[in-house]
């Protein structure tokens, strides 16, 4: 579950930065999101490979290991769609949970 929260937070940050002329890239870090460097890099690489983000350069470390270098990170249309779908799903979940809380026999 923590991975999906991190994915959502990274995409939200990149979406927010679309409106900034000079984004604070220090916030795009493991330290900012309070996760390990290893987890952060892994999630960033997955987001890139899935087409949710762009603007990073992959650096092969040998074998299946990669690092990345941010060039001009940005959210893609696919990343925006992910945010929209997950925001809608959260709203639907809250609505259904609220209905269940009000009418416990249903």
Residue spans for each PLM region:
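Alpha-helix N-cap/helix-initiation sites
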Residues: 3-4, 21-22, 37, 89, ...
